[in-house]
Amino acid sequence: MFFQSILFLFSVLNGFFTIPKRGYAKECSNYRTIALISHASKVMLKIRQARLQQYMNCELPDVQAGFRKGEERAQIANILWIMEKGREFQKNIYFSFIDYVKAFDCVHHNKLWKILQVMGIPDHLICLLRNLYAGQETTVRTGLGTTDWFQIGRGVHQGCIFSPCLLNLYAEYIIRNTGLEEAQAGIKIAGRNINNLRYADDTTLMAKREEELKSLLMKVKEESEKSWLKAQQSEN
């Protein structure tokens, strides 16, 4: 069947362009790359994305609200509610807000394919994604000329409908490996221990004691570095 095919025929029509964000225009870090994708590619990707979304919804816990329909504002409301209850019952609650440096740009491709396998994503979907990212090259233009072309091995396509799902699964793998689900640190809500709330890669850690929060934070940082993500200085 056509839709079972794992060949991706339209990637040749795709391109990447840089868009200035803010700040000094000659600073590379002040630009964001965005993928421009042909209409034929978008039709194919939309069909595949709907299938990937089904697997993603089964794998992600309810503490993850990133890019999930109807959940966009849930975590802000949850954090505010927890803070209000802490004041009401005069309980100390410690928070740490983790923001990764350029998370979309730092996703390691080979690591991503392994994570998708661990998450139970079908081989034909993984193969399609690999084809979408295969053979990517870039060059850098400087005042001294243009560099040789070199392979790109990191970063998901910003502007592609697949990318939010891929980042969610990548971030979920990191949190699973930290063992936060089994950790005793956290706060009790309706008999359930909660120590993290997430929106994609943005993670809020919480605990009743400062030492517990530091322990959670170190676990997340260590696992993040193993997957080539770097956490910015957290706001506590």
Locate the predicted segments by residue.
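Conserved pre-catalytic core of RNA-dependent polymerases
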Residues: 1-171
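Structured loop/turn residues at secondary-structure junctions
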Residues: 39-40, 192, 208-209
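Short secondary-structure junction motifs
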Residues: 62, 90-92, 182-184, 226, ...
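Catalytic palm subdomain of template-directed nucleic-acid polymerases
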Residues: 102-119, 155, 197-226
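Short, conserved micro-motifs composed of acidic
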Residues: 144, 231-236
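A shared catalytic/ligand-binding motif for oxyanion handling
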Residues: 171, 184, 203
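N- or domain-start disorder-to-order transition segments that initiate the globular core
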Residues: 177-178
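Active-site nucleotide-donor binding segment shared across nucleotidyl transfer reactions
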Residues: 181-197
